[in-house]
C-alpha cells in the first residue's frame, strides 16, 4: 500500500517547533509498523507565497502592493507594518532558525520533491492508495480563506481512495455559519476513518452527523523518551528554568516563571515562536535570563529534556514535558487543547492560572500514573490507525454532482497579444451578471469586442482554481499557467459549450478573445 501523509509539516509561518516534529513522529511510527509512506510537500491555502526564510521581505512586498492599489484595509496595513518591523529586527536570527528547520526536514523526512497546494491537487495525480491527514490544527476555518480542502482529503486526486484522519484538531477558528457547517460535514463524510485530538471535536462530529470519531494521542506521544533522545542536542546551560510560550502574549506564564526562578535561584532560558528580538522578560526584572530565537528542533528538544523546570502555554511544550517526565507548569491558553491534554493525564494541577498556590506548594508529578495512562492511550491510538489501514475499502462514489453544483464568475476579456497594437473600441472586459454553473451546458457568448484592424478568430479559456490560474489546452486538459510549456491551447468558437471542469475550487473562468489580420 502506498500512503501519502498531508499535514502542516514545514509550512508554519512562525516556525513553530511542533509542526515538523509531529509529522516526523507520525511518519516514523508508520515506518516502525512496516508501512512505507511519503509526506506530501503541501502548502496550506493561507500560505499565499509567504517567504519562510525572510518574512520581512514578504511583508515589505505586501505593503508595497497594498499601497499601490490604494487599499483601504487600514488594519491589515497596520498589522503588516508591525510584522515587517518585527521580522526586520530578527532578520539574521530568522534565517538561522529557518536553515536549522530545513536541515532537520531534509535529513529526516521522506517527502515528495514537488510542492503541491490545494489547486495543484485538483489536476495532478499522486497515485497513492491511501491518504492520511495528520494533526495539528488542520480543520480550522481560516479567516478570509475558509477550510483547506487538502487538509480534509477533499482533492480530486484523492477521490475513491482510502481516507483517514489522525488526531485532527480544529483550534479556535471554526464553522460559524450554516454554509460553513455544511461544508465541514460534507468533507468529513467522505473520510473513511476519523480520529481527532480533542474530546470536544469528537462530540461535535458525533452529535451532528452519523460519523464516529476516536480520540487519539498527538503523534509525538506515540514515541518514548529513548526515541526522542536520539534527536536531542544537549545545551551547555545547566540549572535553568525553560520558558516556552506561543501565540498569545502569555503574560501570566512569563510573570510566574520570573517569580519561580528568583525564588529557586534559576536562570531562565526564554524561547518563543513570536518574532521578538529580545523576548518578553522585562530588563527591569531581577531574574537571570537568556533569550534565544535562532535555535533548531534538536536544541529545543534539548532545552526541554535537561531543564530543571518548565513553564509553558504550549500544547507540545506540555507533550514533551510529559515524554521527558519533567516538572512543568502551564499558563493560560485560548482553546481547549491544552486543557484536554492535562485532563487526559490527570494533570490539571499543573495549571496555575486558576490556582496560583501551585507555585508555592510546588507539587510533584506521579509519573508512574502518567505512564500507565500514556500506555493505555497509545494502545487505543495504535489500534485505530493499524485497524484503519488494514480495512479494505471499495469506493465508487461519483463526485461529479458536487462539482457541477459549483458556481463561478464568467468573464470575457480583450487583451492585446503578439503583434496586435490596434486600439480596441468600446469595452475591454465583460462579466456575466449571474454566476455560471459548472455543468458543461452553458454557451460561450458571441464576440462583443470590436477592432478596426483585426477580426475575431476564437476564444481561449483559463480557469482560476483557488488562487492559481490554469489554461485549458487542446487535449482538453487543465495546465497550471506556471507549468505551461507552449502546449497548443483549445480554440473555442462563439456559441461553443463551456466545458464541464472535473475539479473543485473553481472561482473564475475567463474567455479571452484572440484576433487575426483582417
Roles of regions detected by a PLM:
Residues 402-518:
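Secondary-structure capping and domain/repeat boundary segments
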Residues 1-404:
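Active-site anion-handling motifs in enzyme catalytic cores
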